[in-house]
């Protein structure tokens, strides 16, 4: 019999499940972690400990609980909080803590700057989203302005699911739905684009685009 394993990494906890071919649950596990608040308005995770560490721990716990041969796991699904902003090196290793989704408001000044430069209505029309603390683009600009050494050293800027999938497969990939939060450099129907902001980041430093149903 073959099995499917799924893990979801959340703000304060990660959880996993293994199901058989009929959808019957054969194992579950979870693991808590902390959200770091190093400064007011900031919210961070430690990717190696909180994301990958949880993933490995939960997989091991569920395999031990079920007694399943790991080779019988035919499909792995990874879901994680997002959109987050994480600079990584060429090997996919984190260069800093990850700035989390909308609960992290460090880029408020950068949102105002991009709105003034590009135009709020233009961004909304082209991207389908206004710039908010949920947007990754302003946080990339924040990183470039406030942590230039880390920005320059980063081979890629990724989000949480990309980080985990790269650990599993070696592929640096992001699904279109997550990438849509990278405004103003992801446009509706176009993907990565410098049409609104050409000098924010080189596009070879962003993950390859794919659909959430693609196998990588």
PLM region spans:
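Gly/Ser/Thr-rich active-site cleft segment
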Residues: 9-11, 22, 88, 123-216
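A charged helix-plus-loop insertion that forms the helical arch/lid used to bind
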Residues: 93-106, 181
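Short alpha-helix plus adjacent loop in nuclease-associated cores
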Residues: 102-117
């Amino acid at each position: 019999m073959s099995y499917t394993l799924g893990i979801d990494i959340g703000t304060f906890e990660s959880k996993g499940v293994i199901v058989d071919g009929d959808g019957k649950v054969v194992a579950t596990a979870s693991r808590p972690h902390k959200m770091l608040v190093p400064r007011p308005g900031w919210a961070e995770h430690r990717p190696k400990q909180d994301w990958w560490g949880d993933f490995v721990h939960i997989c091991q716990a569920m395999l031990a609980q079920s007694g399943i041969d790991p080779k019988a796991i035919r499909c792995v699904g990874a879901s994680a909080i997002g959109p987050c902003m994480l600079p990584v090196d060429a090997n996919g290793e984190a260069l800093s803590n990850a700035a989390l989704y909308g609960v992290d408001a460090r880029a408020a000044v950068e949102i105002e700057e991009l709105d003034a430069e590009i135009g709020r209505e233009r961004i909304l029309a082209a991207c389908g989203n206004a710039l908010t603390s949920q947007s990754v683009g302003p946080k990339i600009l924040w990183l470039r302005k406030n942590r230039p050494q880390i920005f320059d050293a980063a081979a890629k800027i990724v989000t949480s699911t990309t980080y985990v999938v790269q650990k599993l497969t070696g592929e640096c990939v992001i699904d279109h739905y997550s990438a849509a939060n990278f405004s103003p450099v992801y446009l509706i129907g176009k993907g990565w684009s410098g049409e609104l902001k050409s000098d924010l980041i080189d596009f070879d430093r962003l993950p390859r685009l794919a659909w959430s149903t693609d196998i990588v």
